[in-house]
């Protein structure tokens, strides 16, 4: 189910919520298998992290994730690149 199908008046994203942008160590744009967790890139708000993520090269987006407090059905504790892209598309409607 896509995020767009979950939208109603009760769904709201707090873009000022604390969040961290993290990147998985990589070799040739692929996650390095020898690591067990991503490292910190940005410690700020969800908005800060989304902006920094979108500024990264598209070919590297799969290496990044955003960690934040869950917010209903729209925002989970760990946001993958595809989830971040959906939130960016919905942002103008929220």
Model regions and ranges:
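Short, compact, well-ordered microdomains
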Residues: 55-94
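Short aromatic-glycine-(Arg/Gly/Cys) micro-motifs in beta-strand/loop hairpins
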Residues: 9-37
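N-terminal, charge-rich interaction modules
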Residues: 2-10
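A short, charged, amphipathic alpha-helix used as a generic interaction element across diverse proteins
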Residues: 45-59
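Short, intrinsically disordered, low-complexity terminal/loop segments
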Residues: 1-3, 93-94
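Local beta-strand/beta-hairpin segments that build beta-sheet-rich folds
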Residues: 38-42
């Amino acid at each position: 189910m896509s995020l767009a199908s979950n939208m109603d008046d009760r769904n709201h994203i707090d873009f000022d919520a604390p969040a961290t942008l993290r990147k998985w160590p990589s070799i040739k744009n692929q996650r390095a298998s020898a690591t067990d967790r991503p490292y910190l890139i940005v410690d700020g708000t969800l908005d800060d992290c989304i902006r920094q993520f979108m500024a990264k090269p598209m070919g590297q987006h799969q290496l990044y994730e955003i960690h934040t407090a869950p917010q209903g059905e729209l925002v989970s504790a760990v946001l993958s690149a595809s989830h971040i892209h959906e939130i960016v598309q919905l942002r103008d409607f929220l």
